[in-house]
C-alpha cells in the first residue's frame, strides 16, 4: 500500500473540511426558518454571522495571496454568500434597535476589510504580506470560535439551549478538527492554530447542551402553561392548557373553554 504524502493528506483533510464547513454554514438554517415563521429575530444575535462573514472575506484574500489554496477559496466563497443571506434575513425581521446596531457593525466590517486589503497589498510584499494577513486571519478565526461565548453565557443564565443548536456545535467541532489537520500537513500555522481553540470551544458547547437540554422543558412544565382544572358532572378532571404568549388571547381562550363546559352540562 502506497504511503500517503503530506500533500495528499492535506488535500484529503481540506476536502473533508470543505464538506463539514458546508454543513456548518447550513446548520443555522433551522434557526432562520424559525425566525421566518415567527416573523421576528428577537432573542437571536447577528454577531456570530457578522464575524463569520468577516472571517470568510479575509480568508479569501489570504488564499489569493498564498496561491493554489483552492480548497480555502471554494468554501469561503460559499461562506460569504450564505452569511450575507443570514444577515439579510436577520435585518428584515429584526426590531429597529437591532437593525441599527447590525447596520453599524456591517459598516465597521466593510471599513475594516477596506483598510486591511489595500494597506497590506501596497505596504508589504511576498512572504511578509502573507504573514501579516495570516496573523490577522488567525486572530479573526479565534474570534469566530469565541463568538458563541455570549450564547454559552445565555445558556448558563437561562438554562435553555434554544439559541445553541447541538448540530451547530457538533459540526463546528468536526470542522475545527479537519482544518487543523489540513493546516498541520500543509505546514500552515495560521490555519492550524485557531482550530485548536475551535475544537475546545466546540467540546464545551456540546457539554453545555447535554447539561441544560432538559432544563427548559422542566421549567415550561412548571411555570409557562396556564393550567386550570375543573370537574365535569361525571367527576372527570378536565385540564385546560393555555400557552398563548398574549395574555388577552389566553383569557379569551379560557372563557371559550369554560363556555363549552357550561353548554355541555
Curated annotation (Swiss-Prot):
Signal peptide: none
Tissue-specificity statement: Highly expressed in nectary tissue and weakly in the stamen, especially in stomium cells and in the upper part of the filaments.
Highest taxon of source: Eukaryota
Subcellular compartments: Cell membrane
Main location: membrane
Single biological process term from Gene Ontology: anther dehiscence
UniProtKB keywords: Cell membrane, Membrane, Repeat, Sugar transport, Transmembrane, Transmembrane helix, Transport
Record-annotated MtN3/slv domain positions: 11-97, 132-216
Transmembrane segments: 9-29, 45-65, 72-92, 104-124, 131-151, 165-185, 191-211
Positions on the Extracellular side per record topology: 1-8, 66-71, 125-130, 186-190
Membrane topology: Multi-pass membrane protein
Positions on the Cytoplasmic side per record topology: 30-44, 93-103, 152-164, 212-265
GO cellular component, one term: plasma membrane
Deletion phenotype: 'Early open anther' phenotype; anther opening in young flower buds that contain immature pollen, resulting in poor pollen quality and impaired pollen release.
GO molecular function terms listed in the Swiss-Prot or TrEMBL record: sugar transmembrane transporter activity
PANTHER family: BIDIRECTIONAL SUGAR TRANSPORTER SWEET9, RAG1-ACTIVATING PROTEIN 1
Similarity remark: Belongs to the SWEET sugar transporter family.
Quaternary organization: Forms homooligomers and/or heterooligomers.
Protein name: Bidirectional sugar transporter NEC1
Annotated organism of origin: Petunia hybrida (Petunia)
Gene name linked to the record: NEC1
Amino acid at each position: 500500500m502506497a504511503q500517503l504524502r503530506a500533500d495528499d493528506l492535506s488535500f484529503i483533510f481540506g476536502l473533508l473540511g470543505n464538506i463539514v464547513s458546508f454543513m456548518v454554514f447550513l446548520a443555522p438554517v433551522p434557526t432562520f426558518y424559525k425566525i421566518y415563521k415567527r416573523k421576528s429575530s428577537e432573542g437571536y444575535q447577528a454577531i456570530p454571522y457578522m464575524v463569520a462573514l468577516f472571517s470568510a472575506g479575509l480568508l479569501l484574500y489570504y488564499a489569493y495571496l498564498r496561491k493554489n489554496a483552492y480548497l480555502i477559496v471554494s468554501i469561503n466563497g460559499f461562506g460569504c454568500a450564505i452569511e450575507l443571506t443570514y444577515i439579510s434575513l436577520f435585518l428584515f425581521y429584526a426590531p429597529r434597535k437591532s437593525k441599527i446596531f447590525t447596520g453599524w457593525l456591517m459598516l465597521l466590517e466593510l471599513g475594516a476589510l477596506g483598510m486591511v486589503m489595500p494597506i497590506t497589498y501596497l505596504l508589504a510584499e511576498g512572504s511578509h504580506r502573507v504573514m501579516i494577513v495570516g496573523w490577522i486571519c488567525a486572530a479573526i478565526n479565534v474570534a469566530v470560535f469565541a463568538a458563541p461565548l455570549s450564547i454559552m453565557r445565555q445558556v448558563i443564565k437561562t438554562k435553555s439551549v434554544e439559541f445553541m443548536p447541538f448540530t451547530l456545535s457538533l459540526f463546528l467541532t468536526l470542522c475545527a478538527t479537519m482544518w487543523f489537520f489540513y493546516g498541520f500537513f500543509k505546514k500552515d500555522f495560521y490555519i492550524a492554530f485557531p482550530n485548536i481553540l475551535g475544537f475546545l470551544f466546540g467540546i464545551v458547547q456540546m457539554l453545555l447542551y447535554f447539561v441544560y437540554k432538559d432544563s427548559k422543558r422542566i421549567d415550561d412544565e412548571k411555570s409557562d402553561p396556564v393550567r386550570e382544572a375543573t370537574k365535569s358532572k361525571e367527576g372527570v378532571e378536565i385540564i385546560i392548557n393555555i400557552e398563548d404568549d398574549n395574555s388577552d388571547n389566553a383569557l379569551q381562550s379560557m372563557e371559550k373553554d369554560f363556555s363549552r363546559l357550561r353548554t355541555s352540562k
